[in-house]
Structure formats: structure tokens, C-alpha cells
From Swiss-Prot:
Important role in the capacity of milk to transport calcium phosphate. Coiled coil: none annotated. Keywords: Milk protein, Phosphoprotein, Secreted, Signal. It holds the Pfam family Casein. It comes from Oryctolagus cuniculus. This is Alpha-S2-casein.
Length: 182
């Protein structure tokens, strides 16, 4: 931070030209004496209004606009989202939040290839395995009758943004021992 302030002060000090007070007539005379051959350049430069360099117009920019520009550049929300991302399910009946844990683990690419190779081979099932598969089919047909809300089906697409201060409070409250009545 000190280095940044030092470089800013150095840049301002080097950027200010040291010009003595002189009238506009003197500057025109000096410029014509230096370059008498370049009449076209001098005439176009003299036609433009001459401004005194020492008279600088200062315009104040409100600090609120500066602050807004700074926070738009930083965008802190994306960092908070990256810290605490886990899928949650909103239960419509109790309106409580629970963590959504996937029931089936996702297989990697090599495991999927191996699984397709093994399924192409014919295997004979024992009676216990056949009974278990029959039971699974019955359960699947039974649970297909129930209609779940759409937002429960897409539980993995919902991400809750957490405020780090609230997260710290929950951790503290969980670690405090409580006394139960006997």
C-alpha cells in the first residue's frame, strides 16, 4: 500500500510541468520565432483558443460513485459462493433446509467403460438375486405412483449462498455444550 501511494505521488510530481507565467501574446511570438518556416502549423495553432495551463478545472466526483465502481470491479459475492457451495433441498412441508446427498455415486469414465463390458456378458443369476430384482421392480412401480414437486427433483441444481458471519454463529452454537434435565 505504501509503495502504491509512493508511486502515485511520484507520478504526480513528475507530471506537473514547470511553466512560468506568460501572456498569450508572448507565447505566440516565441512560437513564430522558433519556426518561421512552418507558417501553416503556427496559423492553425493560433486559431484555436489558448488556455492557460496553470488554470485547471477541478470537478468533484461523489465518493458514492467511486465506491460503487470499486465494488462492481471486485464482485465479492462470487468469492462467498465459491466458499460455501453445497446442494440443499427445501422441504415444502416444514420449510427446513437439509443437505442433499446423492444416492448413487457418479462413476468415472473408465469405470463406465468397464461396466458396459461386463453387462454385455451373459451371467446366470441365483434365485436370491432374481427375487431381489423382482422386489426392486415392485418397489419401483410402487414409488412411481407418487408425484414429487419439481423443485425436489432438481435438488442438485440449487445452490445456497451463505453469509460467512452466520456460518460462524452456527458453528459456535453447535460447539457450546448444553445441559439436559435428568
Amino acid at each position: 500500500m505504501k509503495f502504491f501511494i509512493f508511486t502515485c505521488l511520484l507520478a504526480v510530481a513528475l507530471a506537473k510541468p514547470k511553466i512560468e507565467q506568460s501572456s498569450s501574446e508572448e507565447t505566440i511570438a516565441v512560437s513564430q520565432e522558433v519556426s518561421p518556416n512552418l507558417e501553416n502549423i503556427c496559423s492553425t495553432a493560433c486559431e484555436e483558443p489558448i488556455k492557460n495551463i496553470n488554470e485547471v478545472e477541478y470537478v468533484e466526483v461523489p465518493t458514492e460513485i467511486k465506491d460503487q465502481e470499486f465494488y462492481q470491479k471486485v464482485n465479492l459475492l462470487q468469492y462467498l459462493q465459491a466458499l460455501y457451495q453445497y446442494p440443499t433441498v427445501m422441504d415444502p412441508w416444514t420449510r427446513a433446509e437439509t443437505k442433499a446427498i446423492p444416492f448413487i455415486r457418479t462413476m468415472q469414465y473408465k469405470q463406465e467403460k468397464d461396466a458396459t463390458k461386463h453387462t454385455s456378458q451373459k451371467t446366470e443369476l441365483t434365485e436370491e438375486e432374481k427375487a431381489f430384482l423382482k422386489y426392486l421392480d415392485e418397489m419401483k412401480q410402487y414409488y412411481q405412483k407418487f408425484v414429487f414437486p419439481q423443485y425436489l427433483k432438481n435438488a442438485h441444481h440449487f445452490q445456497k449462498t451463505m453469509n460467512p458471519w452466520n456460518h460462524v454463529k452456527t458453528i459456535i452454537y453447535q460447539s457450546v455444550p448444553t445441559l439436559r434435565y435428568l
